[in-house]
C-alpha cells in the first residue's frame, strides 16, 4: 500500500471519529487573509529544483561623463511683431438736416459719410499739409455728385491741424473741429454740408509669416507690408486699388504743418480700401526682420557629454540646456542676421574674461536645444594645458602663479568646485548605495540559504511573496504550489487535548498545534481533520503531539486574530493589531543636498509678450473713445418737445381725412408758435433784467392809477372847473376869439337846427363887469339856453388854432420861393 493511500485512510478514520465524538460547540471559525489563505502544502513527485546563487561580485560605480569648459550665448525666437508707421487719409462728409421754428431750431437727421481720399490729394497732404474743400463721388451709373464744405460751391484748400485728443500710438490731424451748421428759413427744412479731412499717423503690426497687418486704429490690411508688386509676397487686396510710387518726398511729421521736415522714401504704397486710403513704406523683409533675438550670455559654463546629447550647465542661471550632438548651420537670411552680433559678443567675452589664461579651443559651434533655443558654444582650454600637450619648454618657463590667481580664474574655479563637489557628492552617494545594496543582497542570499535548511517553505514563500511548498533534497530545494481549501469551511477546535478512539480526552498528551477541520473546494462536503500551521498552513493529520505542560499559555495566529489557549483550552481571541510588532526594519538615512537658490528664467519679458500681439485691444479702445469724443460729440443740442395737447388735436383732426390733416397741421404750427411766444415771455420774466423791468412797469401803473383816482375825485367835487377850466378866466379873454374890442356873444342854435337866439352886443365900456347875478329864478327854458350857450362857447374854444398848428401852417422855404410876390389870404376874409 502506498504512502498516500495510508495517509488518506488515516484522514478518513479521523473524520469518522470526529463526526461521532466531537460536539459543534467545541470549535470556532478560524480567520484567514488574502495573502496567506488556508492551504495544504505537500511535495508532489514532479517538482521544480532550485538553488541559491552566492557567487555575486559587487563593483564600485564610476561615471563616464566627459566635461569641457567654455562659454555660450543663447538666442530665442523673436516673437515681437514687425512694427512700422502707417498713414491713413479720409474725408468725412456730414449732412445735418434741421427745421427752424420760432425761437428754436430742431436737429433732425444727421448723416455722416466717409470717403477715401484720392492719391493726388494725399500728395497734397504729404507735401503741404492741406486738402481740398470739395469732394466728388461717381456712382456706378456714371453720375457724379459733388459736395462742398459749408455749401459755398468753391474748391479751396484747408489746412490740417492736430486734434486735441491723441494717444501714444496715434496722432490725428483734421481740418474742421466742429461740423458746420446753417440756420435755415423760418418754418422750413434745410440741410447743411460740412467736410472734414482726417489724416491719422498710426502704428501697424505684422506677425510672421506677414500675411496681413493690423493698425492700432483697429483696421486690417490683408496683405504683406513687404509686397512690392513683383516679389511674390502674399497680398489679398485688389491690385487695382494699390499704387506704388518710388523716390517719394513727404513731410515726416505733420505736427508743424507745411514747415515740417521732409524725408525721402525709397518706395511707398497707397491702398484704397472702403472709406480709407492707407500708405506705408515698402522695405526689404530680410533687412527689417530678424527671427532670432539675443536672450543671455553665460560667461562661465560647462558642457557634459552623454551618449546622444550635450548638457550645457550654467551656475549663473541655475539651469542646464540639453541639445543633440549635431551642430547647425544658419542659412536662413532671417537667422543669419545674428551672426555679426554673436561673433562680436564672443570676442568681447574672450578678451574681457579669458584672454590671459585661456585659449579658444577651435571655432564656435551652433546647437538647437530641446526648448527650440539657439545656443552658440565656444569651447576653451587652459593655456597651460594646451602648451603642455604641445611640449613647449618656453611655455613651461612662462608659467606664473599670478595668472592662476586672476579674478577670472577664481570665478571659474568656484564654478568648477561647485560642480565637482555636487558631482562627487551625488556620484559617491550613488556608488556607496549601489555597493552597499550589492553586499547586502549577497549576505541576504547566504542567510536564506542557511535558513532554508530549517524551514524551506517559509523561506521560499517569503522570496516569492506567495505561499510556496518547499522541501530540501540534498543541496537543492524542491518547490511546488500549495492547494487552497474551502476558506469558509475551516473551523478551529477549542481543545488541544488528544482524544482516543473511545472519545476520552487524555490528561497527559496534548497537540502541539490546534486541530482544524476543513473541506476541499469543488468536492464532497465531507470534513477533513488537520492541524493549524504557520501563516494559515494546514498540516494534514493529527500526529503532532506533546506531553501536556500545566500551567501553559499558547497563542496561535490565524488571519487577523490571535487565538489564546490556556492549559490547552481556547479562552479568547484578540485582534492581531493589539500585539506589538517587533520592528526589525533598518531604514536608510541619507543627508540632503545643500541649498541651491534657483533663479526664475523669463524667456520673454512682459513687454515682449505684449508686443507679440498684432491686436492691442487696450490701445484700440483708447483710440476709439478719444476719436469718438473728439469728432462725434455735439457740444449742445436745442430740442423742444411739441406740447401734448397739440398732438392730441392733431390726432383728432387726422381722423377727418385729408382736410382735417391739413387743418391739423396748420393748427399745430400755430399752437406751436403761440407756445413759443408764451414760453419766450415766461423766459423773459424769469430773467433778472426782465423781472426788474416788469417791477418798474408795475410801479408806474400804480402811480398812474393813483393820479387818475385823485383827478376823478377832483372832477366829482368841481365838475365845472374841471370840465370848463376857461370859465374861471376873466371875461376880457373871450374877446380874443373874435379879435374885436367888444364882447360878442355868438349865436346859439337850437338842438333841432332852428334859428339862433339873438344876443345883445355891448361896447366894451358898457360891459357889465360887476359880476353880480340877479336873484330872479331862471326857467327851464333859460337853463337850456344857457347850457347851449356854454356848449357853443366850448366848441369855439376848441376850434381855436394851437401854436403847433399855426407853426405847421407857416409856408416852407420852397413854398415861399415858389409863391414869392403873393400874400396869404385870411380864411375868414376869404
From Swiss-Prot:
The chain crosses the membrane at residues 689-709. The record marks 399-400 as: Cleavage. Its main location: virion. This is Envelope glycoprotein B. Residues 23-688 are virion surface. GO terms for cellular component: host cell endosome membrane; host cell Golgi membrane; host cell plasma membrane; membrane; viral envelope; virion membrane. Residues 1-22 form the signal peptide. InterPro entries: Glycoprot_B_PH1, Glycoprot_B_PH2, Glycoprot_B_PH2_sf, Glycoprotein_B_ecto_C, Herpes_Glycoprot_B. Residues 98-104, 184-191 are annotated as: Involved in fusion and/or binding to host membrane. It comes from the Viruses. Residues 710-830 are intravirion. It is a single-pass type I membrane protein. A motif (Internalization motif) lies at residues 822-825. SUPFAM superfamilies: Viral glycoprotein ectodomain-like (SSF161008). Disulfide bonds join 41-482, 58-438, 131-197, 290-337, 510-548. The gene is gB.
Amino acid at each position: 500500500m502506498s504512502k498516500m493511500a495510508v495517509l488518506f485512510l488515516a484522514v478518513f478514520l479521523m473524520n469518522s471519529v470526529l463526526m461521532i465524538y466531537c460536539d459543534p460547540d467545541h470549535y470556532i471559525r478560524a480567520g484567514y487573509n488574502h495573502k496567506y489563505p488556508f492551504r495544504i502544502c505537500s511535495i508532489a513527485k514532479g517538482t521544480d529544483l532550485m538553488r541559491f546563487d552566492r557567487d555575486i561580485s559587487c563593483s564600485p560605480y564610476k561615471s563616464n561623463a566627459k566635461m569641457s569648459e567654455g562659454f555660450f550665448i543663447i538666442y530665442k525666437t523673436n516673437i515681437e511683431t514687425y512694427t512700422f508707421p502707417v498713414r491713413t487719409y479720409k474725408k468725412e462728409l456730414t449732412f445735418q438736416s434741421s427745421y427752424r421754428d420760432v425761437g428754436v431750431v430742431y436737429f433732425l437727421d444727421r448723416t455722416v459719410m466717409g470717403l477715401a481720399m484720392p492719391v493726388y490729394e494725399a500728395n497734397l497732404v504729404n507735401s503741404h499739409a492741406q486738402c481740398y474743400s470739395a469732394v466728388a463721388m461717381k456712382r456706378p451709373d456714371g453720375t457724379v455728385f459733388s459736395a462742398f464744405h459749408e455749401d459755398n460751391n468753391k474748391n479751396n484748400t484747408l489746412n490740417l491741424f492736430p486734434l486735441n485728443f491723441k494717444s501714444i500710438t496715434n496722432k490725428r490731424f483734421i481740418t474742421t473741429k466742429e461740423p458746420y451748421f446753417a440756420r435755415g428759413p423760418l418754418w422750413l427744412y434745410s440741410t447743411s454740408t460740412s467736410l472734414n479731412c482726417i489724416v491719422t499717423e498710426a502704428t501697424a503690426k505684422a506677425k510672421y509669416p506677414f500675411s496681413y497687418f493690423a493698425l492700432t486704429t483697429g483696421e486690417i490690411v490683408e496683405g504683406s507690408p513687404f509686397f512690392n508688386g513683383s516679389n511674390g509676397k502674399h497680398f489679398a487686396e485688389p491690385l487695382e486699388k494699390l499704387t506704388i510710387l518710388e523716390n517719394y518726398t513727404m513731410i515726416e511729421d505733420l505736427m508743424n504743418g507745411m514747415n515740417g521736415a521732409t524725408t525721402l522714401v525709397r518706395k511707398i504704397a497707397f491702398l484704397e480700401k472702403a472709406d480709407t486710403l492707407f500708405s506705408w513704406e515698402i522695405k526689404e523683409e530680410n533687412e527689417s526682420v530678424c527671427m532670432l533675438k539675443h536672450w543671455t550670455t553665460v560667461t562661465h559654463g560647462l558642457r557634459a557629454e552623454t551618449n546622444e546629447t550635450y548638457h550645457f550647465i550654467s551656475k549663473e542661471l541655475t539651469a542646464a540646456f540639453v541639445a543633440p550632438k549635431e551642430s547647425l548651420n544658419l542659412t536662413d537670411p532671417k537667422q543669419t542676421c545674428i551672426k555679426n552680433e554673436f561673433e562680436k559678443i564672443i570676442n568681447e567675452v574672450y578678451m574681457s574674461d579669458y584672454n590671459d589664461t585661456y585659449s579658444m579651443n577651435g571655432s564656435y559651434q551652433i546647437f538647437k536645444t530641446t526648448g527650440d533655443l539657439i545656443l552658440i558654444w565656444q569651447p576653451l582650454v587652459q593655456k597651460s594645458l594646451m602648451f603642455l600637450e604641445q611640449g613647449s619648454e618656453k611655455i613651461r618657463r612662462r608659467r606664473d602663479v599670478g595668472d592662476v590667481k586672476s579674478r577670472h580664474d577664481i570665478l571659474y574655479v568656484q564654478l568648477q568646485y561647485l560642480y565637482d563637489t555636487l558631482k562627487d557628492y551625488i556620484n559617491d552617494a550613488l556608488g556607496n548605495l549601489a555597493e552597499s545594496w550589492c553586499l547586502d543582497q549577497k549576505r541576504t542570499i547566504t542567510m536564506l540559504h542557511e535558513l532554508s535548511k530549517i524551514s524551506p517553505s517559509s523561506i521560499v514563500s517569503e522570496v516569492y511573496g506567495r505561499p510556496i511548498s518547499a522541501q530540501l533534497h540534498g543541496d537543492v530545494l524542491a518547490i511546488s504550489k500549495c492547494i487552497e481549501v474551502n476558506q469558509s469551511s475551516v473551523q478551529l477546535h477549542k481543545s488541544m487535548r488528544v482524544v482516543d478512539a473511545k472519545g476520552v480526552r487524555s490528561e497527559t498528551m496534548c497537540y502541539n498545534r490546534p486541530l482544524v477541520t476543513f473541506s476541499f473546494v469543488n468536492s464532497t462536503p465531507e470534513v477533513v481533520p488537520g492541524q493549524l500551521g504557520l501563516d494559515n498552513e494546514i498540516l494534514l493529520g493529527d500526529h503532532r503531539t506533546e506531553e501536556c505542560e500545566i500551567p501553559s499559555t499558547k497563542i496561535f495566529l490565524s488571519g487577523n486574530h490571535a487565538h489564546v489557549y490556556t492549559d490547552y483550552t481556547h479562552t479568547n481571541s484578540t485582534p492581531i493589531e493589539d500585539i506589538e510588532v517587533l520592528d526589525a526594519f533598518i531604514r536608510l538615512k541619507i543627508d540632503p543636498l545643500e541649498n541651491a537658490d534657483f533663479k526664475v528664467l523669463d524667456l520673454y519679458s512682459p513687454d515682449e509678450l505684449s508686443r507679440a500681439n498684432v491686436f492691442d485691444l487696450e490701445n484700440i479702445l483708447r483710440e476709439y473713445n478719444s476719436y469718438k469724443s473728439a469728432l462725434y460729440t455735439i457740444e449742445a443740442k436745442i430740442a423742444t418737445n411739441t406740447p401734448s395737447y397739440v398732438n392730441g388735436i392733431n390726432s383728432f383732426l387726422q381722423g377727418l381725412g385729408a382736410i382735417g390733416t391739413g387743418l391739423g397741421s396748420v393748427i399745430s404750427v400755430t399752437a406751436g408758435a403761440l407756445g413759443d411766444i408764451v414760453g419766450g415771455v415766461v423766459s423773459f420774466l424769469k430773467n433778472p433784467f426782465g423781472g426788474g423791468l416788469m417791477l418798474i412797469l408795475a410801479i408806474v401803473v400804480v402811480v398812474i392809477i393813483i393820479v387818475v383816482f385823485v383827478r376823478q375825485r377832483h372832477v366829482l367835487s368841481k365838475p365845472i372847473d374841471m370840465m370848463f377850466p376857461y370859465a374861471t378866466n376873466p371875461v376880457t379873454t373871450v374877446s380874443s376869439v373874435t379879435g374885436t374890442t367888444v364882447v360878442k356873444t355868438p349865436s346859439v342854435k337850437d338842438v333841432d337846427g332852428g334859428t339862433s337866439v339873438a344876443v345883445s352886443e355891448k361896447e366894451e365900456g358898457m360891459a357889465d363887469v360887476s359880476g353880480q347875478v340877479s336873484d330872479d329864478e331862471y326857467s327851464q327854458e333859460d337853463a337850456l339856453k344857457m347850457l347851449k350857450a356854454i356848449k357853443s362857447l366850448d366848441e369855439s374854444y376848441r376850434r381855436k388854432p394851437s401854436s403847433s398848428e399855426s407853426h405847421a401852417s407857416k409856408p416852407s422855404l420852397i413854398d415861399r420861393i415858389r409863391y414869392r410876390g403873393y400874400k396869404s389870404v385870411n380864411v375868414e376874409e376869404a
